[in-house]
């Protein structure tokens, strides 16, 4: 039963509720529209690398021209979904003899989706972004198929009675709208008469996406094999999609050889705006400092100068930072493949399949590919490792790789839990022997493109429109059964840049070639672009806000707080701004403590920081405990229309905060937990309660 009041608002006040709701929806819709207007169309690959231009936006015609009977579309923000789409297409071709192609949803129109022959299959690999939103490149597709007056070319009844499709989603189970994009697309297509092959796959980023993918595709393939009368091949032989040839007429210093440049403009030294996800801006680092540092932990504050560019941001947006791989990992990758001596050899890549686009620039070098273009530090997949078994340096290694490929638990114990990437896995399983027989094209095809890392912007666009700041925890941790530490690629790259900026002691491990291709970066610029979000302060500055952000989860809230401080300085009235911040100890990792004092001096009692130190005192105290202590004040603020925000660890902290808020509502209102959960759900639906989400 739903309670007859929602936070002090009686059902009899429906007229007022309607007006308030209309205002809320209008405001949030305005932000959504603004974000969409500001947000450039996102391609998963930089424009320069699309060597095979499409003849048009008619994918059915393209399939017919190329003789394809299976197309795998992807909706991807960081390249992960694109990677799974490529793997799916590759397996369909090698294992079942399908004629496959991979396609970006943003590159085609879907008016003729009903023209796909019933003898074909369409597959979707779809990531969910934000609070159930489509990725940038899937927005138009979703908008079209979900339109009330959607009108396909042939006008069948049902509309898509000829369409056979399969769907795998990428999401995070800890979020409310888990895999909403994949579920929604499947629901819409099914409601229009399309036939879903198998179940909708749910990849969980909070669990093991790789194993979720493996579990989903086997029954899907089984059903598809039956429906399309496919024959599974007994022996899977690697069939290269890309040819790699040496080019002895050039060397790494040749002007037309890519040595890390992100597009042709940068290669020729004439890069210019507009800057966006396919043309990142080489932003100068305006300021950088370590907020704290210890033997095993660091935290960086870094500011990027975007003054004079077309890049605009709003408080609450994300900035994408394009990293490079560390020297040690580049060396290890080339060494285990026996390519150290050939690292600077110029090679050209070409596609054997007209539908497959070369994912990296060409011509280039082995060193460049490993350093700038591939995710060589990413966890190796069980499927990819198993594919390499025939190229093992000896029989015992082949047997071990085969076992790792077949035994999920064995793979988890010896590879996944040790956080091994492809080079360390190959070196471990072969006891240090080199794998010189693997075609290099296998790595280009199977390892994702090195993707930008997205960080919450921790500055205010009202206060600093020409500067974007980030607050980054540097990832460095010990791993069981592993001698060396595990290092985050991008965060340690930023740490190296910070040390260089301030003339500090260089980072011993990992080290980076921070000068960039042809010394273009000089250790002082970083490729970046802006991604807009709907994580916003309320448009009414008098509305209270409650923010929960332990650790670097405080990043977007620093932007919110600085925005409100600036509003006060401009003479605007502001509501109570309450921050719950948690860390280990006040002395060790209380970031921005002095800054909060400065804010307090300006905002007075309109600003308050409630701290939770987990390693001070006999008992551990976390932000959810402080929420319970402040239950009465939180209830009062919510009755005044406060917006509630959470950013940080989604798997643990955010879930605990959600439970605490639900309990506060239940106890203070005297309603059941089920009723309190319904109230919290409605708060989320109206964007009164927002969670800052990681981008998959």
Where do the protein language model's features map onto the residues?
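FNR-like FAD-binding dehydrogenase module
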Residues: 1-696
């Amino acid at each position: 039963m739903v309670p007859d009041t929602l936070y002090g608002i009686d059902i009899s006040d429906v007229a007022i509720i309607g007006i308030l709701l209309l205002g809320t929806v209008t405001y949030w819709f305005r932000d959504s529209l603004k974000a969409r207007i500001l947000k450039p169309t996102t391609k998963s690959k930089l424009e320069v690398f699309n060597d095979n231009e499409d003849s048009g936006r008619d994918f059915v015609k393209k399939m017919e021209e190329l003789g394809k009977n299976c197309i795998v579309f992807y909706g991807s923000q960081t390249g992960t979904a694109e990677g799974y789409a490529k793997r799916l297409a590759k397996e369909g071709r090698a294992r079942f003899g399908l004629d496959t192609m991979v396609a970006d949803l943003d590159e085609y129109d879907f008016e003729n989706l009903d023209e796909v022959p019933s003898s074909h299959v369409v597959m979707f690999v779809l990531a969910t972004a934000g609070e159930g939103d489509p990725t940038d490149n899937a927005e138009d597709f979703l908008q079209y198929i979900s339109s009330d007056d959607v009108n396909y070319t042939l006008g069948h009844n049902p509309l898509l009675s000829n369409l056979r499709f399969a769907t795998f989603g990428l999401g995070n189970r800890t979020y409310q709208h888990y895999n909403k994009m994949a579920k929604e697309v499947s629901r819409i297509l099914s409601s229009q008469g399309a036939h879903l092959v198998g179940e909708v796959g749910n990849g969980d980023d909070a669990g093991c996406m790789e194993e979720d993918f493996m579990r989903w595709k086997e029954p899907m393939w089984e059903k598809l094999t039956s429906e399309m009368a496919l024959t599974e091949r007994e022996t899977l032989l690697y069939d290269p999609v890309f040819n790699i040839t040496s080019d002895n007429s050039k060397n790494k210093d040749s002007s037309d050889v890519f040595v890390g440049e992100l597009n042709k403009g940068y290669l020729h030294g004439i890069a210019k705006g507009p800057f966006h996800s396919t043309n990142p801006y080489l932003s100068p680092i305006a300021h950088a400092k370590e907020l704290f540092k210890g033997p095993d932990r660091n935290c960086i504050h870094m500011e990027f100068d975007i003054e004079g560019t077309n890049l605009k941001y709003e408080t609450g947006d994300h900035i994408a930072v394009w990293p490079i791989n560390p020297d040690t990992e580049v060396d290890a990758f080339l060494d285990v493949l026996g390519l150290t001596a050939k690292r600077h050899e110029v090679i050209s890549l070409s596609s054997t399949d007209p539908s497959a686009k070369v994912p990296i620039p060409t011509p280039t070098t082995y060193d460049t590919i490993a350093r700038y273009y591939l995710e060589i530090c990413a966890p190796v997949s069980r499927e990819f490792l198993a594919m390499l078994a025939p190229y093992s340096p000896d029989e015992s290694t082949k047997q071990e790789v085969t076992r790792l490929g077949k035994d999920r638990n064995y793979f988890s114990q010896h590879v996944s839990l040790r956080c091994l990437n492809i080079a360390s896995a190959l070196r471990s399983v072969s006891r240090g022997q080199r794998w010189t027989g693997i075609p290099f094209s296998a790595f280009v095809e199977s390892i994702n493109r090195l993707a930008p890392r997205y960080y919450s912007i921790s500055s205010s666009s009202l206060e600093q429109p020409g500067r974007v700041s980030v607050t980054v925890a540097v990832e460095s941790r010990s791993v069981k059964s592993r001698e060396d530490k595990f290092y985050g690629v991008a965060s340690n790259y930023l740490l190296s840049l910070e040390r260089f900026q301030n003339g500090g002691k260089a980072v011993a491990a990992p080290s980076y070639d921070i000068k960039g291709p042809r010394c273009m970066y000089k250790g002082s610029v970083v490729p970046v672009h802006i991604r807009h979000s709907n994580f916003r302060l309320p448009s009414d500055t008098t509305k209270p806000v409650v923010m929960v952000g332990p650790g670097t989860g405080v990043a977007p809230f620093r932007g919110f707080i600085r925005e409100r401080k600036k509003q006060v300085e401009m003479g605007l009235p502001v509501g109570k701004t309450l921050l719950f911040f948690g860390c280990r100890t006040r002395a060790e990792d209380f970031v921005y403590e002095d800054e909060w004092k400065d804010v307090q001096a300006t905002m007075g009692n309109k600003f308050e920081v409630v701290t939770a130190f987990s390693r001070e005192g006999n008992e551990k105290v976390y932000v959810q405990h402080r929420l319970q202590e402040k239950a009465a004040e939180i209830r009062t603020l919510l009755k005044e229309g406060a917006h509630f925000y959470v950013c940080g660890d989604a798997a643990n902290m955010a879930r605990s905060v959600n439970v605490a808020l639900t309990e506060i509502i239940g106890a203070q209102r005297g309603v059941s937990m089920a009723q309190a959960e319904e109230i919290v759900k409605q708060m989320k639906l109206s964007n009164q309660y927002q969670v800052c989400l990681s981008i998959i």
